[in-house]
């Protein structure tokens, strides 16, 4: 059996080019006193393992969990610069201009994140260049501790 195919001369995915996904968001969570709510030393801290991430996929809110990943919920705790914060991977695997991600801090408190992505090489290169939290643009903006694509959330 023989098979043959002709390469489309248009914009197609080229497997010889690298896949680049620069989409992570670094979120610092504080109370109104400026105390880090991801630190167990802070009263009423938020246990980062209890935070849930949902993607809006085809009008359905889908909870993210993949046991095979280092960060199965697409949320990782970072502990550097004498601080703790979370890195979130927002929804980026579609062609929507502003895909939606929900962060559920607890059963009563959910924030909405929308991102804009620069997409090239038929989607093999994706870079988050703008972020909105609950409708307000937070990136580009003032970076926290000089951390790229970071912002504060006050709870």
Question: Would you name each region that the model predicts?
Answer:
Residues 8-13, 34, 81-90:
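Charged, amphipathic alpha-helical segments
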Residues 13, 29-44:
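Short amphipathic, basic-aromatic surface patches that mediate peripheral association
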Residues 36, 59-63, 109, 137-138:
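Short, solvent-exposed loop/turn motifs
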Residues 111-155:
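Glycine-rich, aromatic-bearing surface loops/beta-hairpins
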Residues 21-23, 97-99, 111:
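Residues at beta-strand starts and edge strands
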């Amino acid at each position: 059996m023989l098979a043959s195919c002709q390469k489309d001369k248009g914009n197609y995915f080229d497997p010889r080019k690298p896949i680049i996904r620069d989409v992570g968001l670094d979120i610092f969570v504080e109370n109104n006193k400026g105390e880090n709510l991801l630190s167990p030393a802070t009263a009423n801290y938020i246990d980062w393992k209890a935070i849930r991430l949902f993607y809006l996929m085809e009008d359905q809110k889908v909870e993210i969990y993949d046991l095979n990943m280092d960060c199965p919920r697409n949320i990782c705790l970072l502990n550097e610069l004498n601080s703790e914060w979370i890195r979130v991977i927002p929804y980026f695997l579609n062609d929507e201009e502003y895909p939606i991600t929900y962060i559920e801090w607890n059963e009563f408190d959910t924030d909405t994140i929308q991102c804009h992505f620069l997409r090239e090489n038929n989607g093999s290169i994706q870079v988050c260049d703008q972020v909105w939290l609950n409708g307000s643009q937070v990136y580009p903006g003032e970076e926290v501790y000089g951390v790229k694509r970071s912002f504060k959330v006050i709870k």
